[in-house]
């Protein structure tokens, strides 16, 4: 039996026992790259901006929606930074909520993190499959569900293999994919703005400050927009989930989360403003599923318009890979603490990655993707809306956990109060408000793409699966591993011991 002693004041001992993930494998820049890539900027913009415009009362104010959506998520990013400074655990939200609030709640919230990763992988695989065929002019295959599923599964399997090979290969892949994606988005935006002001498109509009003013919308329109905005920003926390493999693990990953949110708001505003200025709101509203697929990309980039297709493809590909990373590490942390079977904490002796957890993250993603695709593509779209509910839950509770964990520190200075209590709590409350409104909104049958089941829409069922499934998991594990649930609540300054039994680990090469 090995014992890891960890002081929750920002320092960490040197644990012995089973293999650990590779230390200092990722730089601060790699943390930012992984965090930004996980949000799939090109795909998120292509599939979201048009829907902003479609919301009654939003129109030209899409940039204002992006700004307002940024605020609560920036607040939560500061909570990630504060918690990572004292507990750089790859389980992030699971670890922090279980220690600050309760082990039962930590396991429930940790389950929603894993479920959100699995749910979104299906959508990203569908995009990768469809765009992969479009890139080569195979439009019939791109619209054929079976063909798209087969190619999407190949993408998931290939990206799971890259994650399996090691974190450094994963980071290198991300740098290439994100570099190409961001370069194309910037070039597209600059050219679009130049053409908008040159008058080459009669529908072009000049940018005005009113576009950025949220007070020119109704509160209902603003809430509807923020429901989408949460999905737009989700994913930057992946850069924190690889903290144990990062340089300066206490500080770098947390700072990267905050920086990632600013990178995202910058590129989102640039592309949204440029697209709206060049094409106008009528075009964006007419092409909500993919604003780049119509005449926008051809009008801006001419014969090079196919590069935007590649950009969206690389975006979905990068996001699929970076979604496998946090799911596996969340399971690793849970297994290490005994919240789920300890075999999920296996570390591959050569690749130094979560062995069983990585494979199961890929397997469950494939199973979910195939199952949802068989039901309906509309269900797949509604699952993305439900994903926003899961994100609100686990981001929100991360904010609450931060305030509770630092409860005896928050009144020691104004800075502490603002960064450790006010911002995390406001961020959490805002996301709980969005969650409540979203449950009401998607509870109305008119707001679902697919038919309701037992009176509820698919997004609501995703939320029920998240909370209900988590409760069932907690009940089962209370009987199977009661020692985890006896762990006391922690606060800043406490020292804990995490006990790991080597005899509970099977060899990493015998995972299946």
Which positions does each model-derived feature cover?
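Membrane-helix boundary/coupling elements in multi-pass transport proteins
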Residues: 89, 112-127, 233-246, 268, ...
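Helix-loop-helix connectors at the membrane interface of multi-pass transporters/channels
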Residues: 95-99, 125-150, 179, 184-185, ...
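Membrane-interface "cap" regions at the ends of multi-pass membrane proteins
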Residues: 1-60, 73-74, 78, 476-512
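C-terminal membrane-solvent junction of multi-pass transporters and transport-like membrane proteins
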Residues: 29, 344-351, 395-444, 453-458
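TM-loop-TM module centered on a large, flexible mid-protein loop between adjacent transmembrane helices
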Residues: 95-97, 102, 134-139, 212, ...
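Extracellular loop-to-transmembrane helix junctions
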Residues: 44-148, 260-263, 458-470
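Membrane-interface loop-to-helix entry segments
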Residues: 147-202, 257-261, 388-395, 405, ...
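Helix-loop-helix junctions that connect adjacent transmembrane segments
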Residues: 17, 24, 59-66, 137-147, ...
